Amino acid sequence: IFHQAGCDWTMPSRPGWDNSDMCMFTGDYEMMGRIKRAHFELAQKLRVKRIVMGECGHAFRSVYDQGNRWLGWKDSPVPVVHAIEFYWELINEGKIKITHQYEDPVTIHDPCNTVRGRGLADKLRDVVHFLCANVVEMTPNREHNFCCSAGGGIINCGPPFKSVRMEGNRVKADQLRNTGVHTVVAPCHNCHGGLEDIIKHHKLGMHTKFIGDLIYELMEK
């Protein structure tokens, strides 16, 4: 996608390239600050103009919200954007063109860290409607959408909590089932894991996709 859009980009090869941050889940804010410092220091050494975060909600929040504050920074030393924002820019600037739209009906899951936390509901929908011909909204949606069952790092607590997550979030299973679609667009890694667990446990016959999956599948190459 980066190459097709003609972006000038790089991927670090040293520590600091990955923003997965278990410290945010465990409450180890001192270590979280160290991880963020390494990330931004590496970005500054590379002299990049901004950091594009992948489709991961917790990593994004640990950068744009919590890591900065625990380091005592008012703003990030290097601007940070989520993949939703970046894809939106590429599409609106005409840098990504698609050969056709995705025809099967899809629904949109709103990740908490990008929609409630960052306010990206409109841009998320702009991107999905550009890519997909038939979008069916969940009810409720946007900032009122139901949790994926993986939030706050609970999915990483493993098997002992899985049955609680599955049975305790039947409301999400019902919400998904009521859309009548088979494809869920979820731009967050944790949400993918949580939704896939719900889909399998409740036998919903659905599958999940990242926005990047759809763009690569549909774009001119």
What are these regions (language model features)?
Residues I1-K221:
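Iron-sulfur cluster-binding electron-transfer modules in prokaryotic oxidoreductases
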